[in-house]
Amino acid sequence: MTDIPKLGLGTWQNTDPEECTNSVKTALEMGYEHIDTAQIYENEEEVGEGLSKAEADREDYFLASKVWIDQLSPENVKSSTKESLEKLGVDHVDLMYIHWPSGDYSPQETLKAFKELIHSGEIKNIGVSNFTPEQLDRAMEIAPKHIVANQVEMHPLLQQEELLEKCREHDITLVAYSPLARGEVFNVEELNEIAEKHDVSEAQVSLAWLMEKDNVVAIPKATSEEHIKDNFESLDLELDEEDIQKIDSIEREGRMVNPDFAPW
């Protein structure tokens, strides 16, 4: 299985140019090794600026972006990826995702184009995002050696047991976006109790719970140095069995990201 760093910096809705650049620079200098962006975020250039300002060696961080749904025809996959690399100021990304199985997505044709980008050296691995278990099965039939991750919303209020099981079955990583449930984790009683017990934040509890699981990586968005640091410190938090059981048994569900074109 491709080794994806357990904690990454998400950059969705990080649209203030200076703030975005600074957050990427701060994260890398703090020790983050995984940066996640996307074409639709319209901040690849600012992310690239942050990478450059941090003066980190390219092999020291794992960089991911995503092709938007209107660019998933074979020719657009290639041209838009080239554009992404130019904006990011790099010669390759470690992981390029199909952002949603929607729009111009055609399993056979789209994945063929992605595989060609691996052969040309522009991307190292293929990712899918927001794929259902059935869609993941289909994609894995077409590109079993190249798909390494399915990025989906996952947090204590959306635990994704079935999808995680499917990712483990295929020996790929589930990359959890919105791992703090858009701030809702601060309002979950079970997380409040565990945070108080360990004298940490609810964000750290949620992230530690995710990262404790096999095949799971988390990419919380953060812009301030304080939040970037708080999230990073979750790597040092060890939850006990009682904590994990308490979170696992939360039955309330809340999906935060649900566009009209979602496949579920």
What is the predicted role of each segment?
Residues T15-L28, S73-L88, E109, L136-D137:
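Short, acidic/polar
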Residues T15-E18, D36-E46, D70-E75, G103-S106, ...:
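Acidic-and-aromatic substrate-binding clefts and catalytic sites of carbohydrate-active enzymes
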Residues L9, I35-T37, V93, I126, ...:
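Alpha-helix N-cap/helix-start motif at helix boundaries, enriched for small hydrophobics
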Residues P101-W264:
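Beta/alpha (TIM)-barrel catalytic core signal, keyed to glycine-rich beta->alpha loops juxtaposed to Asp/Glu
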Residues V77-Y97, E116-S120, I142:
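CE4/NodB-like, metal-dependent polysaccharide N-deacetylase domain
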Residues M1-Y61, R252, A262-P263:
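N-terminal binding-site loop/beta-alpha segment at the start of enzyme catalytic domains
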Residues Y32, V90-V93, I123, N215:
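A structural motif
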Residues E59-Q71, D94-P101, N130, M154:
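A short, structured active-site edge motif that brings together acidic residues
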